[in-house]
Regions:
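Second-shell loop/turn segments in exported
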Residues: 193-198, 202, 249-257
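Extended non-globular interaction regions in eukaryotic gene-expression and organellar proteins
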Residues: 399, 460-548, 565-585
Length: 612
């Protein structure tokens, strides 16, 4: 069990010695920290680095809802304590938020001029004051930072784990489910406090509520990605050379559409509660005057009485002005928000369009579409095959999907590693006959190249791909259990590196012929004169008797194991298994393999198929 380090022990001791702190309050703080091993580890690091130097109670009656952090002094001001000395969920959430704020405060970012800048105290203060200004927002963020992705796994990350400055795209904010990170534009939070409160606070309140809901939606979006992966894989593998990915892409975009609509509703609820703190009688008329255009997705002028504001058709507010998450409200908000056409659409004002993405010129279908199409291309290149001598042909109904080739590329088409120099040909079936199109890998350029597309491969930040279900699930779960053990030994929680290690070990285990029934062991190397500790990842199985001990052991460098994303490593394994199956069939038809050397149980001849 991890204990508080010397620095954190000193900080807790100083807190206990304050005249304005009761024994119950000191005990509640200490036990809340010690009850959350991940929080304890992070606070140990903050204290050891000198970024955390003390805790102090808030001023009675005016404590910040979730606490606050002062970068210069390193002091965290705590929210109001609950009665008793036992750990509390509210204090745990506040401490997690403050630990995130400490890391945010001491981070840096690259500005629009490609210059590295440090996060300022104004950025921290404006972010935290926004959270503390809306009880609804404070409650939801507190819930997000204390809700585990997998409640059965004590090492599971929370739904939200990081704040970061946003760069590289036009957006009010983003949430990345791969890293559990909410990113905020420095230009918004970097204002002086007086200017921020006057011009930016309401908008950021909405944005934080919106992005927090994305954190809650990530589980359902992960399921949507798995369904997408299964559907496009089936299309690519079937015996029809025409691979039309329109339907699975459409279904994935529909999931993103619902995700965004729910996030909008949460943004409204955070904002109306902020306004309610200074105007308890807030109504739609008051909301229309608070100085943010975001409310126009929810309300409109009453045509019969232009002095009054009413809900837009299909939207039904509660008596207190909040917006319930009903199917009707979700559907209406999806139409008013997600379905807006892209910026620059003739005849429409800026408020009637959407301008997001790297260039700020994209609508939502193309923003999410870039990632969906990139993902489909990856599976197509891994599994598509000629049928009766006919080469595979990728098809998309661009009009049905509301896609524009140029906007897809502006948002970023990513071609699989090792194949980026080969553009992806597709056929647009919305025309008769279908029109040939070309998508190029344009990472870093974000430019459309005539006559065919070219752009940077930014995956949609709100919903990056998750790992698909895999046929060798039982073996994979055994390996993941072993990797959890390695993580625990290293004092770290599960993260993307853990996924990469697991997928690499699965590929290596499959090549060696290991199965889920084997007693598998895992370890990193210990330090030697030539190697530092942890440079080599070992795997072996016990209980097998063989004259060849090497048959039961395998290893690879940790660098190699971490080099490839889990999805790509799993795709490599499936291709390897397909190749092996084909070789076995050929061997059965042609007789024994005549090659002198065998590798990992299969004939060791070269293949020109590159898996990704």
């Amino acid at each position: 069990m991890t204990n508080a380090n010397t620095q954190l022990q000193s900080i807790l001791g100083q807190f206990a010695g304050r005249p304005d702190v009761t024994p119950d309050q000191e005990a509640q703080l200490r036990t809340t920290i010690l009850a959350d091993s991940s929080l304890l580890q992070k606070l140990n690091q903050a204290a050891a680095s000198g970024h955390l130097k003390g805790f102090e109670p808030g001023v009675g009656g005016s404590e910040p809802l979730t606490g606050s952090y002062d970068k210069a002094s390193g002091i965290v001001t705590l929210p109001a304590f609950e009665p008793g000395s036992a750990p509390t969920t509210n204090l745990r959430g506040s401490l997690r938020l403050q630990e995130m704020s400490i890391r945010f405060a001491n981070s840096s970012y690259v500005d629009a001029n490609q210059q590295r800048q440090h996060v300022t105290q104004d950025m921290v203060t404006n972010l935290q004051s926004t959270i503390n200004s809306s009880p609804t927002l404070a409650k939801e963020i507190n819930r997000a930072v204390t809700t585990a992705i997998d409640s059965r796994d004590p090492k599971s990350p929370m739904l939200l784990e990081n704040f970061a400055p946003l760069s590289g795209t036009v957006a009010g904010g983003t949430f990345n489910p791969a890293t559990k990170t909410m990113s905020i534009p420095p230009g918004t939070v970097g204002q002086t406090q007086s200017r921020f409160n006057k011009f930016y606070a309401n908008d950021l309140t909405f944005v934080l509520g919106h992005e927090t809901q994305h954190a809650f939606n990530q589980t359902s979006m992960t399921s949507s990605y798995r369904q997408f992966d299964a559907a496009v894989t089936a299309i690519a593998k079937d015996n029809d050379p025409v691979n039309d990915y329109t339907l699975p892409i459409e279904n994935l975009i529909k999931s993103a559409r619902e995700d965004e609509a729910k996030a909008q509703i949460s943004g409204w609820n955070a904002l109306v509660d902020r306004v309610r703190q200074t105007n308890p009688a807030v109504d739609l008329n008051a909301m229309s005057r608070i100085g943010t255009s975001r409310v126009e997705d929810f309300v409109e002028v009453n045509p019969a009485n232009p002095t009054q504001i009413q809900a837009r058709p299909g939207i039904t507010f509660s008596h207190d002005g909040s917006l319930p998450m009903t199917p009707q409200n979700i559907s209406a908000q999806a139409a008013y928000y997600f379905d807006k056409p892209p910026k620059g659409t003739p005849g429409l004002s800026a408020l009637q369009t959407t301008g997001i993405g790297f260039h700020g010129d994209s609508d939502y279908p193309n923003y999410y579409g870039a990632g969906a199409v990139s993902r489909a291309i990856a599976f197509d290149r891994a599994y598509a095959h000629p049928v009766s001598g006919v080469a595979p042909q990728m098809q998309l109904d661009m009009q049905r999907l509301r896609f524009e080739e140029e906007l897809l590329e502006h948002n970023g088409i990513t071609l699989p590693p090792g194949t980026t120099a080969t553009p992806q040909i597709y056929w647009d079936t919305s025309t008769n006959p279908p029109t040939r199109g070309l998508l190029q890998h344009t990472q870093g350029t974000h430019q459309h190249i005539s006559p065919i597309p070219d752009i940077d491969p930014r995956q949609p930040v709100h919903s990056p791909p998750e790992r698909a279900e895999h046929p060798n699930n039982e073996l994979l779960e055994k390996i993941r259990s072993g990797v959890r053990g390695l993580d625990q030994q290293a004092g770290k929680s599960w993260d993307e590196s853990s996924d990469r290690l697991s997928a690499s070990l699965l590929l290596m285990a499959t090549e060696k012929g290991f199965t889920a029934k084997d007693d598998l062991k895992f370890a990193f190397n210990t330090p030697t004169e030539k190697l530092a500790g942890g440079e080599i990842l070992h795997m072996w199985r016990e209980g097998h008797h063989s004259p060849d001990p090497a048959a039961h052991r395998a290893h690879m460098t940790t660098q190699e194991a971490l080099a490839v994303p889990a999805d790509q490593r799993l795709a490599q394994m499936e291709v390897m298994q397909q190749t092996k199956a084909q070789e076995i069939m050929q061997a059965q038809q042609q007789g024994p393999c005549k090659h002198n050397q065998h590798k990992l149980g299969r004939c060791d001849y070269a293949s020109d198929h590159e898996s990704n």
